[in-house]
């Protein structure tokens, strides 16, 4: 929990 990931 508390993990955020994103891809551009």
Swiss-Prot record:
Keywords: Amidation, Neuropeptide, Secreted. The keyword Secreted applies. GO terms for cellular component: extracellular region. It is found in: Secreted. GO terms for biological process: neuropeptide signaling pathway. The modification Leucine amide is found at residue 8. Belongs to the allatostatin family. May act as a neurotransmitter or neuromodulator. This is Carcinustatin-17. It comes from Carcinus maenas.
């Amino acid at each position: 929990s508390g993990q955020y990931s994103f891809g551009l």
